[in-house]
From Swiss-Prot:
It is found in: Secreted. Keywords: Amidation, Disulfide bond, Secreted, Toxin. The modification Leucine amide is found at L14. Expressed by the venom duct. Is present in all duct parts with a highest content in part 2 (proximal of the venom bulb) and then decreases in concentration toward the end of the duct. This is Conotoxin tx5e.
């Protein structure tokens, strides 16, 4: 998932 630190977590709202 994109909310993982191993991926682009920009979709988490960060």
């Amino acid at each position: 998932p994109c909310c993982s630190k191993l991926h682009d977590n920009s979709c988490c709202g960060l």
